[in-house]
Amino acid sequence: MNSLSFLNHEFEAFPSPELALTDPNGLLAIGGDLRPERLLTAYYHGIFPWFNADDPILWWSPDPRAIFIPGQVNISTSLRKYLKKQPWRFTINHAFTDVMAGCAQPRRKQAGTWITHEIQMAYRELHHNGHAHSVEVWHGERLIGGLYGLAIGQVFCGESMFHRETNASKAAMLLLQQHLINMDFKLIDAQVMNPHLESLGAKPVKRANFIQLLTQFRDNTANPAAWIPSEVTLEL
């Protein structure tokens, strides 16, 4: 029988993702904290935090899971033509804090954000420790889009993206998958399917299959050059 686990502030093991609730889909545990070691343990086992500002910390492992395989991200002919016309430039790990702040801005028709100050502080610490990373899209000196997430071995766990100009978040995703191919990453965890991810080629897989893929690649050593701050070219 699936049941909700309650975590305290002492570090403890997460329950198996198989025990997550089906309604709401994937809710596994409640409580605990956002210390780096707890967050890294969560992602290592296919679990991530997602909660509103007034809620306790909620931990999830949904079924199905949204994933990308690097090299299988879709780019339509119209998007390719659009991006070729843009004077944008792209960087890796140049403005992590600003990317998080961009992602934290409430979306249209949303009253608030799940990327709270607490979340931002926790992931900035992960970035400082070399675990969380960002992709930036620039128009001149203006940050117009980007995304951030965590690297666990040869797996990139995407967290959020944003745009301030049309298609800038899609460009960030395309740049990310290009970079991950070059650095021999094997899997992108996109967490929960939505129309935006689906349009880019995300696929839903059963949680058990996702955990199998995660287990296969999470202990592999990543290319040490993967997250050196750099300016890169989007190849279209």
UniProtKB/Swiss-Prot annotation:
HAMAP family linked to this entry: Leu_Phe_trans
Class in the EC hierarchy, top level: transferase
SUPFAM superfamilies referenced in this protein's UniProt entry, alphabetically: Acyl-CoA N-acyltransferases (Nat) (SSF55729)
Top-rank taxon: Bacteria
Designated name of the protein: Leucyl/phenylalanyl-tRNA--protein transferase
Similarity field: Belongs to the L/F-transferase family.
Function: Functions in the N-end rule pathway of protein degradation where it conjugates Leu, Phe and, less efficiently, Met from aminoacyl-tRNAs to the N-termini of proteins containing an N-terminal arginine or lysine.
Naturally occurring in which organism (per UniProt): Shewanella sp. (strain MR-4)
GO biological process, one term: protein catabolic process
Gene: aat
